[in-house]
């Protein structure tokens, strides 16, 4: 048995075979392609197009702002173009038969006109300040106010086509670029993840670990700061705690503090007796400067037969020269005294009172304006100068004597006082002061009253 035949089926198959055998160019010729126009333009160089009726002719395109009226009649001839009328435009070279209509900014979309339509460009529409463009389609947009980020902070500011990006504070969540209170959050919404507080353990542990690290550091820094302030005050004001001062500052206790328990008037030294030639409590004036150290002769009163002119340091008794209470009357009420001198036969060696007279003569011989400079040359530190000044703030003369006495205690015993003083005064261009000092030691001028301190 053969296959059943359907009337007309054979004829349809034959026609289909004939169509498949036809060349593809013939098929495409039946349906014009969308890119025909571009293919035709590609046959001509840039800036020209194919004549609409003669494919062998390439005509020049019309400039922007114009449109095509008629093609060029022949190669090398100009195309006939005409300028666009008001309300129309062409934004590039073209061979359009008519210009494009200008668009209008839509007020219902809150659009504003940025620049008007011209023959060579379309109208430019935009938004007002603090607005952005929300596109409803590829060409249509609506102007929307930028979010002010209330109850939050601005992460990314508002741009031309993008709203503000906000970071909401605690207790708020982000909904359509606005921070909304968590009280408006309903169950089974995405905001529940943002509004629910984190687990208690996650919050507590970091705080505990941070506190455990920071608290000891804060306590340690506080103790260091208090210790520094305490040491600074003790070194600055040593009268407060003399024992602590001597331990911390590694400096001997100030002389006044050491001798505070002694009587106001110390007993006279066995090597010293009142005479009419010398009084250690008196100051000696220094009228001027004249000669160096070596050129000044020594008076017989202070010669080697009477006392050691420059005794060793170990023979100096600090209590005789350093205690400012002995000379407190010089800073308060003038008291008449008699002139004293040495006795040769009873006491052959009197180094303590001799140094006392020399130191007071130096105090009176150096100008007060250059006293600190003098003591720096003698080797006293700035700290010690200030300390002795504060201890003897009531009397400048006693402060100067305390500085000299402190220097004398630390001077090697083989160095004598006047020789060192003379060298220092020479460096300071005050060598003449030594002559005045020696003159005061040779001839102490008797007076009825003690000279007031400077």
Curated annotation (Swiss-Prot):
Residues 1-29 form the signal peptide. Residues 236-454 are cytoplasmic. Disulfide bonds join 44-58, 59-72, 62-81, 84-99, 102-117, 105-125, 127-143, 146-158, 149-166, 168-179, 182-195, 185-191. Glycans are attached at residues 54, 151, 202, 376. Pfam families: Death, TNFR_c6. Residues 30-212 are extracellular. The chain crosses the membrane at residues 213-235. SMART domains: DEATH, TNFR. Receptor for TNFSF2/TNF-alpha and homotrimeric TNFSF1/lymphotoxin-alpha. The adapter molecule FADD recruits caspase-8 to the activated receptor. The resulting death-inducing signaling complex (DISC) performs caspase-8 proteolytic activation which initiates the subsequent cascade of caspases (aspartate-specific cysteine proteases) mediating apoptosis. Binding of TNF to the extracellular domain leads to homotrimerization. The aggregated death domains provide a novel molecular interface that interacts specifically with the death domain of TRADD. Various TRADD-interacting proteins such as TRAFS, RIPK1 and possibly FADD, are recruited to the complex by their association with TRADD. This complex activates at least two distinct signaling cascades, apoptosis and NF-kappa-B signaling. Interacts with BAG4, BABAM2, FEM1B, GRB2, SQSTM1 and TRPC4AP. Interacts with DAB2IP. Interacts directly with NOL3 (via CARD domain); inhibits TNF-signaling pathway. Both the cytoplasmic membrane-proximal region and the C-terminal region containing the death domain are involved in the interaction with TRPC4AP. This is Tumor necrosis factor receptor superfamily member 1A. It comes from Mus musculus. The lineage of its organism: Eukaryota, Metazoa, Chordata, Craniata, Vertebrata.
